[in-house]
C-alpha cells in the first residue's frame, strides 16, 4: 500500500522536528521533506509532489496565507494549517479556510496537550488524503461560483457596514410585537411558538455558512450552529460572520436564552446542547469526550434538540467529512422535525450529508442555494 506523502512547512525547527517524528512513526504516512519557509516549500512541492502539506501561517519571507493562495491557484494540494494562532490572529485561520485550506489545527498551548494535537493532525492528514481528488475538484468549482459571489458581497457589505446597525435597531423593534393570538397559541402549546433552526457543518462549512448567512435576513427563529473548529477560532469566526450578515451572529454562551434573528455558534473544544427553562430554550455548554472525533459534535447538539424542541425544528446537515450529525438528524426526523442534507454537487466534502441520506435521516436533499429558500420559508411559515 502506498504511503501518504507529507511535506511539513514551519519556520520553527522544534515544530518541524515534532511533526516529522509523529509522521514517521505512523505506518500510513511518509515524511518526504520539511521546509523552513514558503520559498523552500515551493521548490519541494514541485520536486517531491506531496499528497498533503502542513503549513504554518506566521513565517519569514512570505506569510502562510499568501503562499496558500498561490498554491491553491497554481498547484492545488490539500493543505492543513498548523499554527499557534492567538486570539488576534484567528482571523488569519478563518481567511485560510476561505482561501482553500483543508482544515486548521491549533499548535499545543494551555491545557491542550501535544499528544492530542498530534493525533488531530495525523487524523486530518489522512482525512485530507482520502478526500483529495473530490476536495480539490469541488474547491475549484465552488471557488468560481459562490466564493467569488461572497467576495462581491463582502465588498458591497463594507460600503454598507453602517446599514447593519440601522437594520438591527429596526429588527429589534419588529422582533417582539405583542400579538394576542400569538400569546394564546403560545399558552395552548409551548411547542408551537418555539421554532428553531439547527445547522451542523465540518470541512467546507466555513464558506458554506458565510454563503448562507450573507443571503439570509429578516425575522428568523433562533439558529444554533455547530461548525467543527478548534477552541478560540469560533469566537473570531462568529465575529466575521456577524460583519457579513444582517442577522446577529455570536459565539454561544452557557445558559443564554435563545432570541429570534440571532445565530449562536458553538464554541470550539466543548459540546453544545439546548435545555428548557420555564418554557424558554437556553444554551447548554458541557464538557465530555469527543463524539465522532469531534468536540463540539453535531450529534450532541441534534440529540439534545430532539429531546427539548420536538417537531418545531428545521435541521440542516452541511458539507463535512465523516458522519457526525447523521444519527442526530435521524432523531430529529423521528420526532417530527424537518431535516435537510446538503446535496453532493454543492458540498465541498460529501461525507456527513451522505451518511445522513444513508441513514434515511433527511426529509429532503438540497443544494446550498435551495437551503436559503427552505430557511426563509420556514421562518415565515
Question: What is the meaning of each model-derived region?
Answer:
Residues 2-4, 13-24, 39-40, 46-47, ...:
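Conserved acid/base catalytic micro-environments in cytosolic active-site loops
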Residues 7, 32-33, 340:
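Conserved beta-strand positions in the Rossmann-like core of class I SAM-dependent methyltransferases
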Residues 9-10, 35, 53:
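Conserved sequence signature across two-component system core domains
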Residues 28-36, 44:
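Short hydrophobic/Thr-rich beta-strand motif most characteristic of the beta2 strand and flanking loop
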Amino acid at each position: 500500500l502506498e504511503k501518504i506523502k507529507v511535506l511539513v512547512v514551519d519556520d520553527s525547527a522544534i515544530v518541524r522536528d515534532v511533526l516529522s517524528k509523529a509522521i514517521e512513526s505512523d505506518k500510513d504516512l511518509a515524511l518526504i521533506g520539511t521546509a523552513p519557509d514558503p520559498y523552500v516549500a515551493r521548490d519541494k512541492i514541485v520536486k517531491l509532489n506531496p499528497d498533503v502539506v502542513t503549513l504554518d501561517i506566521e513565517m519569514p519571507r512570505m506569510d502562510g496565507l499568501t503562499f496558500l493562495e498561490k498554491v491553491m491557484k497554481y498547484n492545488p494540494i490539500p493543505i492543513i494549517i498548523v499554527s499557534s494562532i492567538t486570539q488576534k490572529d484567528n482571523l488569519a485561520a478563518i481567511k485560510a479556510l476561505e482561501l482553500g485550506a483543508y482544515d486548521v489545527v491549533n499548535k499545543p498551548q494551555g491545557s491542550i496537550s501535544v499528544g492530542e494535537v498530534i493525533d488531530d493532525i495525523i487524523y486530518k492528514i489522512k482525512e485530507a488524503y482520502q478526500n483529495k481528488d473530490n476536495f480539490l475538484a469541488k474547491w475549484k468549482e465552488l471557488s468560481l461560483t459562490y466564493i467569488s459571489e461572497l467576495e462581491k458581497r463582502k465588498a458591497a457589505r463594507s460600503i454598507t457596514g453602517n446599514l447593519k446597525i440601522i437594520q438591527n435597531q429596526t429588527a429589534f423593534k419588529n422582533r417582539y410585537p405583542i400579538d394576542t393570538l400569538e400569546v394564546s397559541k403560545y399558552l395552548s402549546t409551548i411547542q408551537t411558538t418555539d421554532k428553531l433552526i439547527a445547522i451542523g457543518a465540518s470541512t467546507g462549512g466555513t464558506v458554506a455558512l458565510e454563503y448562507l448567512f450573507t443571503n439570509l435576513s429578516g425575522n428568523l427563529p433562533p439558529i444554533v450552529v455547530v461548525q467543527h473548529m478548534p477552541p478560540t477560532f469560533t469566537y473570531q469566526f462568529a465575529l466575521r460572520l456577524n460583519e457579513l450578515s444582517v442577522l446577529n451572529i455570536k459565539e454561544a454562551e452557557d445558559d443564554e436564552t435563545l432570541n429570534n434573528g440571532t445565530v449562536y455558534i458553538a464554541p470550539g473544544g466543548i459540546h453544545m446542547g439546548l435545555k428548557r427553562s420555564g418554557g424558554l430554550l437556553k444554551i447548554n455548554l458541557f464538557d465530555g469526550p469527543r463524539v465522532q472525533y469531534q468536540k463540539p459534535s453535531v450529534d450532541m447538539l441534534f440529540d439534545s434538540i430532539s429531546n427539548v424542541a420536538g417537531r418545531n425544528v428545521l435541521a440542516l446537515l452541511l458539507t463535512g467529512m465523516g458522519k457526525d450529525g447523521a444519527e442526530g438528524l435521524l432523531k430529529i426526523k423521528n420526532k417530527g422535525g424537518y431535516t435537510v442534507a446538503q446535496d453532493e454537487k454543492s458540498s465541498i466534502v460529501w461525507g456527513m450529508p451522505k451518511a445522513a441520506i444513508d441513514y434515511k435521516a433527511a426529509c429532503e436533499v438540497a443544494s446550498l442555494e435551495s437551503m436559503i429558500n427552505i430557511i426563509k420559508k420556514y421562518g415565515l411559515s
